[in-house]
Amino acid sequence: MHWADVIAEKLIEERKADKYIVASGITPSGHIHVGNARETLTADAIYKGLINKGVEAELIFIADTYDPLRKLYPFLPKEFEQYIGMPLSEIPCPEGCCESYAEHFLRPYLESLDDLGVELTTYRADENYKKGLYDEKIKIALDNREKIMEILNKFRANPLPDDWWPINIVCENCGKLKTKVIKYDSEKEEITYRCEICGFENTVKPYKGRAKLPWRVDWPARWSIFNVTIEPMGKDHAAAGGSYDTGVLIAKEIYNYIPPKKVVYEWIQLKVGDKAIPMSSSKGVVFAVKDWTNIAHPEILRFLLLRSKPTKHIDFDLKKIPDLVDEYDRLEDFYFNNKDKDELSEEEQEKIRIYELSTPKIPETKPFVIPYRFCSIIAQLTYDEEKEDINMERVFEILRRNNYSIDDIDEFSMKKLKDRLLMARNWALKYGEKLVIISEDEAKEIYEKLKDKQKEWIKYFAEKLKTAEFDALNLHELIYQTAKELGLNPRDAFQASYMILLGKKYGPKLGAFLATLGKDFVIRRYSLFE
């Protein structure tokens, strides 16, 4: 059984509810990356697991748009220093294209979630506060200040100061959340505050967006507002004494609410060179979710994040995207070959379920696919710079030479193929190896430096090419056959070929590569050396 189904089953056993609310959230303080997506996709998998069990469920997403800007991040201009301490929703867009700072980073992520097949209800914290959703919770927190302090102090090395209050007023003068409570009148429900930034003082009701609860109180408050029953969280929140532990006590003792079941997930680290570094928006170590569909289909990201338990650490290496896509293609193959079988082992059932959870829209029949690496080569050779598009006629010529049957490709597969070609080209140019065929003059120079036996083979192979069946399988066999006839190690034949084509000793699978380059070009290249 897939881990999401196991979690859903346990939740139903442990907690009876008319409707199960699965929550996820993010603070849009910077580019929202693949590491952040693990939380949302974990929540989505659990939600789908609940639906699969036949219960009513909803997936909600709460964007912490009312959190303050905490510092000047590396990607921000110097002038944004003036906004430190202001709620993200009240700060201008850093590029002038959105209504606020928060929306600038949030909107692309929400659009990406739509591409990823995630259906959810989105709430923005600034709107929640301004609509008064938190008003009752704020009143309860203020009236129970000492109890909340007692709970928080249980997990603190240094106790909170006696004048601490579970509220942050938004200064009416400078708009910052750096204020100090001077007095609270419970009967009038008014707070007198002083801004620690500009010195402004006033007395206000802390409602309708005039104030915000601190995180450790805000979180349990929202659980009770939205009736949250389960929520994935990073290991920092779930650590002993972390915000989940304090949230559990505040939910029970202050808000009289049964806290949600926690699902802890591990970080995703981005491979940079030989190092794996935890993704961090604030440090600029990110691969934004919005950039994913430039290099691969959404289901590949879902597969990456949902095939393993949330507690499993993931190292994300952009150079290995082709391997990841190949794994998904094999899984898709398995799904369509086995989905209708009556008897499957537990492992086989789990593979079927991984495919179902990874693929937002499962096609009726198995799509026609070309391996991603091969697509990256074809796309670079068939891209029309003038039209800024793939020349599909040339693609089909190459596929025929590579023994692909393309007569019955359906419309869905055709679109998917073209998308993959464009994505694979983007990947190759940015993260893989750009395919550069060296010039004839360069090839001649390299030829002179080859071993005599390699030179002899190139000329012999050139003659054989003129009458050869020009497809990948025949060319592959011809390389081995001609090398054997001349007593040359096939490895030396391959290296010689790569050298006169690419200027290096390695490259794509040679038979397929030669078929892809085409008969005229290949014969001309191997015949240069008279």
From Swiss-Prot:
This enzyme's EC code(s): 6.1.1.6
Residues spanned by motif 'HIGH' region: 28-36
Q: Which UniProt keywords apply?
A: Aminoacyl-tRNA synthetase, ATP-binding, Cytoplasm, Ligase, Nucleotide-binding, Protein biosynthesis
Q: What class of enzyme is it?
A: ligase
State the compartments where it is located.
Answer: Cytoplasm
Any one Gene Ontology molecular-function term assigned to this protein's record: tRNA binding
Query: What SUPFAM superfamilies does the record tag this protein with?
Result: An anticodon-binding domain of class I aminoacyl-tRNA synthetases, Nucleotidylyl transferase
One of its GO biological process terms is: lysyl-tRNA aminoacylation
Q: Return the motif ranges for 'KMSKS' region.
A: 278-282
Q: Which reaction does it catalyse?
A: tRNA(Lys) + L-lysine + ATP = L-lysyl-tRNA(Lys) + AMP + diphosphate
List the CDD domains hit by this protein, alphabetically: LysRS_core_class_I
Keyword Chaperone attributed: no
| A GO CC term attached to the entry | cytoplasm
Q: Name one Pfam family in it.
A: Anticodon_2
Q: Which family does the entry's similarity section mention? A: Belongs to the class-I aminoacyl-tRNA synthetase family.
Protein name listed in UniProt: Lysine--tRNA ligase
Q: Which organism is it from?
A: Methanocaldococcus jannaschii (strain ATCC 43067 / DSM 2661 / JAL-1 / JCM 10045 / NBRC 100440) (Methanococcus jannaschii)
Name the lineage.
Archaea, Methanobacteriati, Methanobacteriota, Methanomada group, Methanococci
Name of the coding gene:
lysS
